[in-house]
Each structure stands twice: as C-alpha cells, then as structure tokens.
Amino acid sequence: MPAWSCLVTGAGGFLGQRIIRMLAQEKELQEVRTLFRSFTPKHREELSKLQTKTKVTVLEGDILDAQCLRRACQGISVVIHTAAAIDVFGAIPRQTVIDINLKGTQHLLDACIGARVPVFIYSSSVAVAGPNSYKVIIQNGSEEENHESTWSDPYAYSKKMAEKAVLAANGSTLKDGGTLHTCALRLPFIYGEKSKFISDTMDRALKNNGLINGFSRFSVISSVYVNNAAWAHVLAARGLQDPKKSPNIQGQFYYISDDTPHQSYDDLCYTLSKDWGLRPDSSWKPPVALLYWFGFLLETVSFLLRPVYNYQPPFNRHLVTLLNSVFTFSYKKAQRDLGYEPLVSWEEAREKTSEWIGSLVEQHKGTLNIKAQ
C-alpha cells in the first residue's frame, strides 16, 4: 500500500481515540489528522505521545462548519467519520441530533468531493436496523436481511439517513475526476475502559449500595469491545485502498461485533463488575408491556405540553424497545470482505474492563473517605 493520510472526526470520543492509536501503528501512514469540537489538555497530551510514531495534527472545529471541514480534508487520503450525537434518552434537542448526525455527514461528504478524498468510512449503528418491536426476535441477523428502523426517534432516524447518504455517495466523481468509495460499519453497544455508559451505570450503582438498577433483563444483544470496533475501521481503510479488496467493499455496510457473549445490557454490566462486589437489583420491575404503554403515555403528555413547555420524558417506547429486545447480528460478512477478526478476546476484554471498573470503585471509596473526614 502506498503512503496515505487519514482524517478522523470525533477524534476525542470513546471510539475515535482508539482508532487514532491503532492508525498510529500503520507503517505507511504519513499523517493522522484529528478533528474534535474541543480537546481537553489530557487528550492533547495523549495525542502528543503518538508523534513519535506518525505525524499527528490536532484540529478543533464543528462538524457543522463546512469551511472547517473543507480545510480538514485537504491532502487527505481517507476519512473515518465517527463524530455523532448519541442520544436515546431525549436529552439533546431533536433538531440538534439530526443536524449533527445527518447534516454534518452531508457537509463532510461534500468536503471530501471538493478536496479529492477517495475513501470515506462511516461509523454507523445497529440502531439503523431497529429493533422495531420487542416482540420480534432477530438472532444472528445478516446484511442480506435488510432490517431497517421505522422509528422517528432522532438518533435512529438521523443515523439511518446519514448511512443512506454515505452509501449513495459511493461512486461520486471527485473534483479531480477521481472516484469516491464509501462503506459503513454498523456498530452495536461498545464497551470497554472509559465507556461513559458503563461509567454512569457504575456511578449510579455505587451510590445505590452496589446495586445495578436496570430495565433490560429481557434483552439479548450483540456488543463489541472498543478496540475491536476500532480495528474494524482500520481494516476498512486498508480494504478500500486495496485494488483487489475494494470492489467488494465499495457501497457496502457491515455489522461489526466480536465474541462477547450475547446477553442483556444488565447481565453484561454485572459480568464486568461482579469482581468488585456490585450486583444486580433483584427488586420487582414492571412488565415490559406496561413500561411500553407508560412510555406512550409520557410521549403523549410531552406532545400536549409542547406548545407551552418542553417536557422530556424519562423514557419512551423506543427506549423500552431498545432495552428489551432480542437483537443480535453476525459479523461473517466483515470477516469475508474486510478480513475482520477480533483483536481482543472476550476474556481479555472482560479482564481489562473489569480492572478499569475496579479503579472507579476505588475512586468512589476515596471520595467517601474525603467526605467522612
């Protein structure tokens, strides 16, 4: 493979940081260009350590700033687009989520065409495929089955439309007459050290006498360790630049997971944290059907109040469905086309994540000791 350069959006995020670390190991890579809305001093320090391996350029900017994106794409061979507003709880205004996820992606595709960037890889989500009903079971689904979300929820909707835009852009003519090649990686729940979801879950559990309070005991999901998710992006970048592999990858989407056992969100969090004395809350939980219809009631209240008050319900039907569905996918197509195999085993991923959770437990104990003094 000839020398190449790569722009990673969302570079300060959970996934983006891991992708950058892996890209820095690529021998032919001349530059990693990192784009994020605002890097912390710690982020900058970590990026500076990679300078000994490859050139790392740090850019701060907004994914909705078209001029910023045009500058960021100049002289780049590959764009890996991970920047996104991830929100299934309704905490972020609907239009903001759609703007970041859809309009931002469209701006970036336009920037790639103008800057003659030939490869675009999109970090998509299994949310674009559903689940549409907690009553429908999908086990080891494949790309050929064409599952598609029917929810109007802003996250699922915006990711679905952005993925469609990315795949439709495959074959577009670049400003210099070249061709843009694209693909999308549909990621499930990503876990690992520094996962905000797990960190927040552990924080609530530690404040609740070690009880993990969840509402997803009926779900069965695919999940992926963060390093394995990052590795799939590196392989996609290699593949779309390989004349032999690229024709099979262009315009395709891939489900990405690993060998983490299919289980509920609650069970996964418990498995990762049980060494530190955390345990599931076994108290009574409402039936899923009741939660679903209560979610509908909350949505109705929110709709009726909208002219005078912006009421954000604590949950809705979409969230209830997400947390209580059997919804798993196979990564065989990624194995075939990308040569994807998980870098990190389930056992190693569990151990590393558990050790990190242990550090959170120790921090919590330290905070309690300080408060007691």
Swiss-Prot record:
The active site is at K159. One of its GO terms (biological process) is steroid biosynthetic process. It is found in: Endoplasmic reticulum membrane; Mitochondrion membrane. It catalyses: a 3beta-hydroxysteroid + NADP(+) = a 3-oxosteroid + NADPH + H(+); 5alpha-androstane-3beta,17beta-diol + NADP(+) = 17beta-hydroxy-5alpha-androstan-3-one + NADPH + H(+). High levels in adrenal gland, kidney and male liver (at protein level). Low levels in female liver (at protein level). Expressed in ovaries (at protein level). It is a single-pass membrane protein. Gene3D superfamilies: NAD(P)-binding Rossmann-like Domain. Keywords: Endoplasmic reticulum, Lipid metabolism, Membrane, Mitochondrion, NADP, Oxidoreductase, Steroid metabolism, Transmembrane, Transmembrane helix. The chain crosses the membrane at residues 288-308. NADP(+) binds at G10, A11, G12, G13, F14, L15, Y155, K159. Its EC number is 1.1.1.270, 1.1.1.210. GO terms for cellular component: endoplasmic reticulum membrane; mitochondrial membrane. GO terms for molecular function: 3-beta-hydroxysteroid 3-dehydrogenase (NADP+) activity; 5-alpha-androstane-3-beta,17-beta-diol dehydrogenase (NADP+) activity. Pathway: Steroid metabolism. Its main location: endoplasmic reticulum. Belongs to the 3-beta-HSD family. Catalyzes the conversion of dihydrotestosterone to its inactive form 5alpha-androstanediol, that does not bind androgen receptor/AR. Does not function as an isomerase. PANTHER family: BIFUNCTIONAL POLYMYXIN RESISTANCE PROTEIN ARNA, SHORT CHAIN DEHYDROGENASE_REDUCTASE FAMILY 42E, MEMBER 2. This is NADPH-dependent 3-keto-steroid reductase HSD3B3.
